[in-house]
Structure formats: structure tokens, C-alpha cells
Amino acid sequence: GFVPSPPAWQREPRPTTLHPIADRWMRRGIPRPGSPAWRYLTVERGIPDTIVAVAVEQGLLREGPQGSMWAAHRRVDGALVGWEERGSQWRGFATGGAKELFRFGPAAASRVCVTEAAIDAISLAAIQVLRPDTLFVSTGGGWSPASEEAIRGLAMRADARLVAATDNNRQGDVYAERLRVIAAETGASYARSRPRAGDWNDDLKILVGRLAEEPVAAAG
């Protein structure tokens, strides 16, 4: 007949220990010319070295694993709450982190361009040559309550101008409409700035390609 056997012993899974967000951020390297994250941004994404250097100077970027880059999400007081993760084979957000806003440019700027990804915010800043009256922000994909609250705070500033610089697709239009409503409710001015291609990084790469061809055409 059937003889029951004692259950096989199994090791309890060891819980993964996550170090505090700020500690994990500080343990990562700062991108430098020629480093994996720097090459990803400048070679694969076409972002000028000068723009990446400014983002690094503002403390916004870190080296991620396997050649990826991390882009900081901070509260208005500067506290780090999470980061976007982007690489050739990877796209994600900090485990245990929170989405608020990636902020690139003058913190007190009255003009705020809202994008969906840090790379798009940096790309738009490059296209607009780091326009000095503009803060380029990213919600990190999606739309968290903290992101909306932060955008409302920016829109409530005196003479605030809210620019919906979201992607050129249906979801981008949905986010743009949310921004239009926020502007109407806070009294900020509003504009929709739509990339010609899918997103601002696509537009930047097209622009960089055209600029690279100009000397050849002139010599031709």
C-alpha cells in the first residue's frame, strides 16, 4: 500500500535586503567621458557630451549595471526618492523607489516642459540648447500621484508656463490633456509641444544626423 514519506526539507527563501535609496545611489559611479553610461547617452542616444556633462554636474546621473544609466527622481527639496533605469537592453525603475520627477535645469524656472522619460527631458534640453528659463522634467513613464502633485506645485508658481512635451502618440496626448487640466486649475499658461517623430530623443538623433551631414554637403 501507500507509505507516506516525510516532506523534503526546503530552505526558506532568504529575504532580499535593499539598502536605503540614497545609499544605493551613492554606491554607483558617476558617469565620465568614455564610461559605459556616458557612451550609452552620447553614442546610442546621440546626446551631446556638453549636455551630459551639465546633467552630471547637477548630480542627476549614475552608472547603472551592464552599461545602463540611472536618472534621479527628487522631491522639490532635493531629496532622492528613486531613479529611472535605461540601457541598451534594459528599461525600469529603482526597486523600492518612488516616482516623482526627474528635474533638469534651473529649479526656479517659470517654464516647465513635462516629458515621459529622463532621456527625453535631456534630449529636449539639448534641442533647446539648455534654454535658461526652462526646467525640463520627466514623470518616468506612467503618472503617479506624487508626480501630479509635484507638477501642480510647479504650475502654481507665479507666471508659470506648463508645456506638455509628451510623446507623439495617443498616450502622450492623454498625458497632455491631464497637464492642460492642471494648468487650467492652477492658472498657469499651457502649450502642447509635440515631437515630430515618436519622442524627443528620436527628434534629437535626426537633428544630430542632419548636422553631421552638413559639412559633407558643403564640401560636396
Annotate each predicted stretch with a short phrase.
Residues 62-155:
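Phosphate-handling DNA/RNA-contact segment within nucleic-acid enzymes
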Residues 126-220:
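TOPRIM fold recognition
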Residues 4, 48-49, 131, 190:
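Residue-level detector of short coil/turn "hinge" positions at structural boundaries
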Residues 48-64:
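Short, basic/aromatic recognition patches
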Residues 45:
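Short glycine/Trp-rich loop-beta-loop segment that forms part of the substrate-binding cleft
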Residues 36-37, 119, 174, 178:
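Short Gly/charged-rich anion-binding patches and loops
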Residues 1-42, 170:
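Non-catalytic accessory segments of DNA primases and related replication-initiation nucleases
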Residues 29, 111-113, 162:
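Conserved hydrophobic helix-helix packing surfaces used for dimerization/oligomerization
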